[in-house]
Amino acid sequence: MKATTVISCLLLASATATAGEYTGKVYVDANRNGQFDKGEKTLKGILVSDGLNVVKTSASGEYSLPGHKRERFLFITTPSGYKTFRHYHAIENGKTEYDFGVIPYNAHLGGKGEHAFLHISDTEISTATGQEEWVSDLRKYAHNEGAAFIIHTGDICYEGGLKNHKPMMNTVNMEVPVYYCIGNHDLVKGKYGEELFESIYGPVYYSFDAGNTHYIVTPMWGGDYRPGYTKEDVYHWLKNDLAQIPEGKPIVVFNHDYWTSGDRHVFSAGKGMDIDLDAHNLKAWVYGHVHINHITRHGNALAICTSTLARGGIDHATSAFRKIGMDSKG
């Protein structure tokens, strides 16, 4: 991994798809109309998940998933070199077929998968009013510097922020893929803490690829309201997700917070349910939450925290977004 630049202002079903409850295909949405049309290309080897099981699409681009009792979404691991305006589908009663369209785009990849992305966190807005300047700066920088994607690691903030943030910063208007994590202040009143987040941003854990790296989005464990998901939910999905990743491929984990103060990165759900992320070639853990500008090495991986974009950090760091570069080794 290259030095980062601060700019101011992981059991069950880990094989090829087999017969199951949910089916569909992953295709290249050439005309961008959001539906599969005759003649459009399907894609082999794309990961699709029901939030527990993870399978790869077949040679014909098709998948089949069994579903599970805690299912809410079907979602894909968006492949490198493609973007999608929706990487997930909320599961509807009586509907069993779900297709996923992806669109090619220029991720500015190097010959060995090198690329860069932009990290923001803790924007904590209540309205889109007054946010125009930093959103514009971020968009322009992403374009000028050839960012592969933008990641927001949570604390979009309460009902107002959750409802207003995505319309002002999304894959369409930023012209690069935009991904979101859930933070503690994004767990709000509802049937369960992430209900509103899910209705706007989709699943709270998922993955995507860019260049030579596999990126994993994970949720905050707690917050202002109790979440419906558990560590066990994330553990089982993550284990199945990582089982599909080629050995040695670099991984980066995104979360709102940082989970260790030691030199090992172990995802633990208790009762022996542990995943050694370092054994999966973890390169970095990228987070926010504490509102500081901080980079340190824990073992073989970097811990990278970026201060808030609109207000700066509690450590007196300037308001910032961060450019992170991945070299040929991740």
Please report, for each region that a protein language model flagged, where it lies by residue.
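Sec-dependent signal peptide recognition
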Residues: 1-9
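Beta-strand-rich domain onsets/edges
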Residues: 12-22
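N-terminal active-site segment of His-dependent metallophosphoesterases
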Residues: 21-22, 30, 92-164
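Short, acidic Ser/Thr/Gly-rich low-complexity loop/linker segments typical of extracellular
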Residues: 30, 34-36, 42, 49-62
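Short Pro-Gly-centered beta-turn/loop motif in secreted/extracellular proteins
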Residues: 42, 64-73
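A short, solvent-exposed loop/turn motif at the edges and junctions
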Residues: 50, 71-91
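Extended active-site neighborhood of metal-dependent phosphoesterases/phosphodiesterases
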Residues: 80, 162-250, 271-284, 292-327
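Active-site glycine-centered loops adjacent to acidic/histidine catalytic or metal-binding residues
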Residues: 122, 154-155, 183-184, 256, ...
